[in-house]
């Protein structure tokens, strides 16, 4: 009996080690070893309404209660903190409030909702040299016939490398919540 227990323990140990190696293999196969990989993109709000100066969210997020027929603009800054030139795409996308830690849920990709149809970002694409930043403007034009109520979105700054021969594409997005 003791021989079988020792053999079983040895086999179990080998199986555990093998499963750890196999479980990590797919991640290692997809690892990007490019030191200048996509990333290091930043975005921040540069201004907030005077009426919201005491609201701590107002300098981090676009926070406004806009009546129908109102148009606002907010200046933002997008930055490239990498060591190479990057093309950064700016666009709004849908979000919602739901269950979870903070409740703010972002839609897939360039998902559209009512608020995103009222939003624009100019410029939509910026080419930034290494370690530089550029301003952009977010405009929200609420139509006259818009329903009252809260709307949610995010303004994205995104970079993307071309897909590899295996179809893998690195995408980096950072955003500003819009309430």
Model-derived regions: residue spans:
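Asparagine-centered strand-capping/turn motif at beta-strand->loop junctions
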Residues: 78-82
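Secretory targeting and sorting signals
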Residues: 1-29
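Terminal connector regions
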Residues: 84-111, 135, 141-179
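Short secondary-structure capping/turn segments at boundaries of alpha-helices and beta-strands
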Residues: 60-63, 73-77
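Surface-exposed binding patches on compact interaction domains or structured appendages
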Residues: 31-61, 83-135
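Short Pro-Gly-centered flexible turn/kink motifs
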Residues: 69-75, 127-139
